[in-house]
């Protein structure tokens, strides 16, 4: 089954409408297609790329996808579009995350770390405070990834080394430092322990470093821990829907992976108030490894 469940629209910083992205998925021959727009951010997270479009436009995004689903409901020759979300992991705002997830009938939730604190990890001009600060940021990034995986709020951990995007060389230097891979392994183990699927993304192939997310060292850890994976394009343009999936499929197979596991919830998270209550208790407390059954 050829699936791409991590895509974006012009609701945020994508370039095309939900309908245009869907038609690109049909043209690409996808069997399963999902639209997973960025979740709205608190005002403190002033990312100029997309925060200005929210929260008002998110409702329109949901309506657009639901209209697409209704239109395609009787079509057996085309994939049924799914409503997903890329949830920004905001550990200082647990109620913001939980409240948002109760508002919409998502089929799946992708968890992402685009920030460490208020630091936007994808912006090159912000990585100017030296090696020691960068190494501390990498450590915090993977500590929070483990916490996200154990929270019970997400189905998928997306682009697991996205933090390398604007600091590629420095990130790989850090990975070679003693103890770094052990810290990453803690995050990967949290995925395995809590049934969170790891995304293998072709988006990194479109960056100057031309390396998938995640890098080989992390793929090896995922294979060792038996984490399930799914493939994704993280397309922000219709030309990238399904792009590079064949390449990352070969990459994943080289580590012994299959990728027929899909990150779909049997029911919407808002029907599971106990999960949200557990998540709030967990996020408001210290950092023990709690496990929540979805």
Positions of PLM-derived features:
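Short acidic/polar active-site loop segments enriched in Thr and Asp
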Residues: 31-32, 107, 155, 258
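A short acidic, often aromatic-flanked loop/helix-cap motif at beta-alpha or helix-coil junctions
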Residues: 90, 118, 266-270
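Domain-core and long-helix interface of multi-subunit machines
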Residues: 11, 106, 111-225
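Residues embedded in well-ordered beta-strands within globular domains across many folds
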Residues: 34, 110, 158, 261-263
């Amino acid at each position: 089954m050829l699936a791409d469940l991590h895509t974006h629209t012009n609701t945020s910083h994508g370039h095309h409408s939900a309908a245009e992205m869907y038609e690109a998925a049909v043209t690409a021959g996808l069997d399963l297609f999902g639209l997973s727009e960025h979740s709205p951010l608190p005002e403190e997270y002033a990312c100029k790329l997309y925060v200005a479009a929210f929260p008002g436009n998110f409702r329109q995004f949901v309506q657009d996808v639901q209209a697409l689903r209704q239109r395609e409901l009787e079509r057996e020759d085309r994939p049924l579009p799914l409503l997903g979300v890329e949830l920004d992991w905001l550990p200082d705002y647990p109620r913001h995350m939980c409240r948002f997830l109760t508002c919409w009938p998502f089929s799946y939730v992708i968890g992402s770390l685009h920030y460490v604190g208020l630091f936007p990890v994808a912006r090159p001009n912000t990585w100017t405070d030296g090696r020691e600060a960068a190494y501390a940021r990498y450590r915090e990034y993977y500590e929070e990834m483990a916490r996200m995986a154990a929270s019970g709020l997400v189905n998928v951990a997306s682009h697991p080394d996205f933090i390398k995007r604007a600091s590629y060389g420095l990130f790989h230097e850090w990975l070679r430092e003693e103890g770094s891979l052990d810290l990453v392994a803690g995050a990967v183990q949290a995925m395995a322990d809590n049934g969170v699927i790891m995304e293998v993304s072709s988006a990194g192939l479109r960056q100057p470093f031309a390396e998938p997310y995640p890098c080989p060292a992390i793929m090896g850890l995922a294979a060792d821990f038996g984490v399930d994976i799914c493939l994704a394009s993280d397309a922000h343009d219709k030309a990238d829907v399904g792009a590079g999936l064949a390449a990352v499929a070969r990459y994943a197979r080289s580590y012994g992976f299959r990728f027929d596991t899909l990150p779909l919830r049997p029911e919407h998270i808002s029907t599971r108030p106990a999960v949200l209550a557990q998540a709030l208790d967990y996020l408001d407390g210290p950092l023990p490894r709690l496990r929540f059954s979805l």
